Amino acid sequence: MLKKILLLGLSLCTMFSFVGCTNSTQTTYEKVKEKKELTFAMTGQYPPFNYIDESGELVGFDIDIANAIADKMGVTAKPETIAWDGIITGLTGKRFDMIIGSMAITEERLEKVSFSNPYYYDGAQLFVMQDSDIADINDLTNAKVGVVTGTTFHSYLSENYPNLEILQFESDVDNLRALKQGRMDALVTGKFVGLSAPSKYGINIKVAGTLLYFEEIGVAIRKEDAELLDAVNTALQDMIDDGTYEEISQKWFSTNILEK
């Protein structure tokens, strides 16, 4: 009797696999196509790449790129905000499908996740208040410098400038606010984020010195999701070829930030 029940269960699973028996074997790409929904994460606090505008809407360059990728794949993009220091854990834990949140491609991160081809180029830049006498990072001795926790900016300063007191913040919005309040001498963030701060937040800051280092920014995807990675790279190339990328980049920066 038990044998008959087991055989019946196996037969039913075979017959009705389309309703759930084999869902566990679906790839992320197959699930995305089936649901027609692509979930992606960012902090929502990294203007002008991803942030909440005055009307409470999540906007920015990353958001437009994500929507365009989803459109090329024939699905809808669904964003999710999360703190930066937990974003890779969220991805590997399958909380969302990918990270489209201005994440730099690094050797350390490549040990945990895969990355798409770069979708823009950026660099770490030191910023100070407009009335500061600091010309570059070599002028900082036992100074306080702000960074966002878990960023490449934090690890770079820790390794190369041990004499600095590094203040950590959850977001660039908090980082910029602290500099304006005089709680530190300088901050390090992405070049484009700092350059947009005066117009975006009315924070009167300026560049101090040249880029500390150059970064390639990519879409982060779980290592096992090779099919999804291929689809994202194809979508990005299509966007470049048909002018979609140029249009988005010009909208936010008045230049093509994929050009070095």
Task: Kindly give the residue locations of the regions a language model identified.
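C-terminal motif of bacterial Sec signal peptides marking the signal peptidase cleavage site
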Residues: S17-G20
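Extended ligand-binding regions for polar small-molecule ligands
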Residues: T22, I63-K72, T149-T151, G218-L258
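Extracytoplasmic small-molecule ligand-binding "clamshell" domains
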Residues: T25-S102
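Short helix-initiation/N-cap motifs at beta->coil->alpha
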Residues: T27, D64, K78-T89, S132, ...
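Flexible hinge/capping segments at coil-to-helix
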Residues: Y29-K31, V128-V145
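Short loop->beta-strand "edge-of-pocket" segments that line small-molecule binding or catalytic clefts
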Residues: K36-M42, I137-G150, E165
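Periplasmic-binding protein-like
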Residues: G44, Y121-V128, L195-Q237, T255-K260
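A ligand-binding cleft/hinge motif common to bilobed small-molecule-binding domains
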Residues: G86-T89, M103-E111, S158-E159, K180-F214
